[in-house]
């Protein structure tokens, strides 16, 4: 049946797959998303980002693949024409080699609850069910609860011809077991000029506080020389990421002006960015101030680490969306002065509540234009949490992912950071009132977190925690090999 005359006077929900293996693949995706918006396609969800081997024509570069959900008033064939126009604007040759190299490939996977068969267009896309590089990002756009609560998504599931819907179709191809296996498909995050796979190892983030009032090392590294010396020390100990902060976020910390924070941060950031020893290392900047974030990004920050997730500065999401840096979103209630107030410590189920509130922050960021493939999450150990809350989070990290997956499987795959380093709850448990005496407890805590699925650990003592991370990674690698 030909649906070329399908009338569309209201918005229809669509799913569009993206692929690229020529030129700057991430820029190709970024420009494609911008052009979709210009042509009347509003993106509502992003998948994770995947690097995949080419199929059919194998003598070509690896692809980046992703997918988006969006809404549009464009009719099916109007949408097809728009996507072809975008491909052409991005340099794709109209009569190029089939399955060959291309700067951009845009395919309509679903269009509302419509089946469409014409000479130019078949929806649902006829090869969805046989392609892991299509199904992986497609699954990301769904939630585990959608099939019961969303009629359009339930219809998409029905098209798979499997009782378990799209999820079962993905599992029949191998599902998550395909990731990292023989290089077929990798879930990656773009940082700078490289793609990072946070499932391969635990990344150690070393803390560099440029503040006079941080709870553990305030005042130690305020000069450029002492800060650089500290960075060199952390590099020698095996750090992966340097997290630089110029505004204290300890309980009851006073908020300084944007200019003061910039004046503390930028001189150090510039020097650290230029250090030869930083090759292969990343720089994260810890700030909840959008003006500071903008200057940090301009001066070489690779990651923006925001303890408020944008709740303390309404311009933060726009600053991050306009950049190319990943965004670390942490769970916190209130601000550093109010986060430990009684009303901010009341939870029904800590992991479920944290996941729900984190999801809300993440969705606000995504709808502001920050793709899911640039988002990382932090459950906020020590922020708006009591002792038992912190312990439950560390021991039940999979529960946070599970709760996130109910709303968005893609967002549930975001790298998780934990930051228990030297925090008061460790001292309360171990009888260590001095923060500097809590390193052994920190190692124990991050070890538990890594074994429960943490991807990044944020610590003061780099050497000991690098050892802990390496041992945990070795144990988990051995466990997975034994399972195979």
From Swiss-Prot:
Physiological role: Catalyzes the first two consecutive steps of tetrahydrofolate biosynthesis. Plays a role in seed stress response and survival.
Region span, HPPK: 15-141
Binding site for (7,8-dihydropterin-6-yl)methyl diphosphate: 249, 286, 305, 378, 423, 458-460
Control of this protein's activity: Inhibited by sulfanilamide.
PANTHER family in the record: FOLATE SYNTHESIS PROTEINS, FOLIC ACID SYNTHESIS PROTEIN FOL1
Top enzyme class: transferase
SUPFAM superfamilies: 6-hydroxymethyl-7,8-dihydropterin pyrophosphokinase, HPPK, Dihydropteroate synthetase-like
GO CC term (a single one): cytosol
Induction: Up-regulated by slat stress. Up-regulated by oxidative stress.
Top-rank taxon: Eukaryota
Alphabetized CDD domains for the sequence: DHPS, HPPK
EC numbers for this chain: 2.7.6.3, 2.5.1.15
PROSITE patterns: DHPS_1, DHPS_2, HPPK, PTERIN_BINDING
Name of the protein: Folate synthesis bifunctional protein
Keyword annotations from UniProtKB, A to Z: ATP-binding, Cytoplasm, Folate biosynthesis, Kinase, Magnesium, Metal-binding, Multifunctional enzyme, Nucleotide-binding, Transferase
Keyword Metal-binding: yes
Catalysed transformations (reactions): 6-hydroxymethyl-7,8-dihydropterin + ATP = (7,8-dihydropterin-6-yl)methyl diphosphate + AMP + H(+); (7,8-dihydropterin-6-yl)methyl diphosphate + 4-aminobenzoate = 7,8-dihydropteroate + diphosphate
């Amino acid at each position: 049946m030909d649906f070329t005359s399908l009338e569309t006077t209201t918005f229809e929900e669509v799913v569009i797959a993206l692929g690229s293996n020529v030129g700057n693949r991430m820029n190709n995706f970024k420009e494609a998303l911008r052009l979709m918006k210009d042509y009347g396609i509003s993106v509502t969800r992003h998948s994770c980002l995947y690097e995949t081997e080419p199929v059919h024509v194998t003598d070509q570069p690896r692809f980046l693949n992703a997918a988006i959900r969006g809404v549009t008033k464009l009719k099916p064939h109007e949408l097809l024409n728009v996507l072809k126009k975008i491909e052409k604007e991005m340099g794709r040759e109209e009569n190029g080699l089939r399955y060959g190299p291309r700067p951009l490939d845009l395919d309509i996977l679903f269009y509302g609850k419509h089946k469409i068969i014409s000479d130019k267009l078949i929806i649902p896309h006829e090869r969805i069910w046989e392609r892991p590089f299509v199904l992986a990002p497609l699954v990301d756009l769904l939630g585990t609860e959608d099939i019961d609560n969303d009629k359009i998504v339930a219809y998409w599931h029905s098209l798979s011809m499997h009782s378990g819907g799209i999820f079962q179709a993905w599992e029949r191809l191998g599902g998550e077991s395909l990731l990292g296996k023989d290089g077929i498909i990798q879930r990656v995050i773009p940082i700078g000029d490289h793609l990072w796979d946070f499932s391969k190892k635990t990344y150690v983030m070393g803390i560099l506080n440029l503040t006079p009032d941080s709870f553990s090392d305030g005042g130690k590294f305020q000069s450029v020389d002492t800060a650089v010396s500290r960075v060199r020390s952390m590099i020698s100990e095996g750090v992966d990421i340097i997290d630089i902060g110029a505004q204290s976020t300890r309980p009851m910390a006073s908020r300084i002006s944007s200019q003061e924070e910039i004046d503390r941060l930028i001189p150090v950031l510039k020097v650290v960015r230029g250090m030869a020893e930083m090759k292969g290392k990343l720089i994260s900047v810890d700030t909840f101030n959008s003006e500071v974030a903008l200057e940090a990004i301009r001066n070489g920050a690779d990651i923006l680490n925001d303890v408020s997730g944008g709740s303390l500065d309404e311009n933060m999401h726009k600053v991050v969306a306009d950049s190319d840096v990943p965004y670390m979103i942490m769970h916190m209630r209130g601000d550093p002065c109010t986060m430990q107030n009684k009303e901010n410590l009341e939870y029904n189920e800590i992991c479920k509540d944290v996941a729900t509130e984190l999801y809300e922050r993440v969705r606000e960021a995504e709808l502001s234009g920050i793709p899911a493939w640039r988002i990382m999450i932090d459950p906020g150990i020590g922020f708006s949490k009591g002792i038992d809350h912190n312990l439950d989070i560390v021991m039940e990290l999979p529960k946070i992912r599970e709760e996130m997956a109910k709303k968005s499987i893609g967002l549930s795959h975001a790298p998780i950071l934990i930051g228990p380093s030297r925090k008061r709850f460790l001292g309360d448990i171990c009888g260590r009132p001095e923060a500097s005496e809590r390193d052994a407890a920190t190692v124990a805590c991050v070890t538990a977190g890594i074994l429960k699925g943490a991807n990044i650990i944020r610590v003061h003592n780099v050497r000991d925690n690098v050892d802990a991370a390496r041992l945990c990674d070795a144990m988990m690698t051995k466990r997975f090999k034994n399972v195979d």
